């Protein structure tokens, strides 16, 4: 399956990433090769092989949910670079609008 440069550019835009035309072409080629390798798995004969969703015998061990004391607020706020109205202020990672 061929991944086009347009598809790579579209996903990059949705991910807020910017690539040069050379990088976009390289990603398209590499991703196409990866998809081709994964598609080879469709040719594997699995007749008679039992379905397994997990080969390890995992067991969920539950514990009682007990509230524990949290951080000392004053001590915590001594270690933050910026605070505003009782909250820790962090840099914005999302802008207004966009396709995503």
Curated annotation (Swiss-Prot):
This is Aspartyl/glutamyl-tRNA(Asn/Gln) amidotransferase subunit C. GO terms for biological process: glutaminyl-tRNAGln biosynthesis via transamidation; regulation of translational fidelity; translation. It comes from Streptococcus gordonii (strain Challis / ATCC 35105 / BCRC 15272 / CH1 / DL1 / V288). It comes from the Bacteria. Heterotrimer of A, B and C subunits. The keyword Nucleotide-binding applies. Its EC number is 6.3.5.-. Allows the formation of correctly charged Asn-tRNA(Asn) or Gln-tRNA(Gln) through the transamidation of misacylated Asp-tRNA(Asn) or Glu-tRNA(Gln) in organisms which lack either or both of asparaginyl-tRNA or glutaminyl-tRNA synthetases. The reaction takes place in the presence of glutamine and ATP through an activated phospho-Asp-tRNA(Asn) or phospho-Glu-tRNA(Gln).
């Amino acid at each position: 399956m061929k991944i086009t440069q347009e598809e790579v550019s579209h996903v990059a835009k949705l991910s807020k990433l910017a690539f040069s035309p050379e990088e976009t072409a390289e990603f398209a080629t590499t991703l196409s090769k990866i998809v081709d390798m994964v598609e080879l798995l469709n040719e594997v004969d699995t007749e008679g092989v039992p379905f397994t969703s997990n080969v390890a015998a995992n067991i969920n061990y539950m514990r009682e949910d007990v509230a524990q004391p949290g951080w000392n607020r004053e001590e915590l706020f001594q270690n933050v670079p910026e605070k505003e109205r009782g909250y820790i202020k962090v840099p914005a990672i999302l802008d207004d609008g966009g396709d995503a």
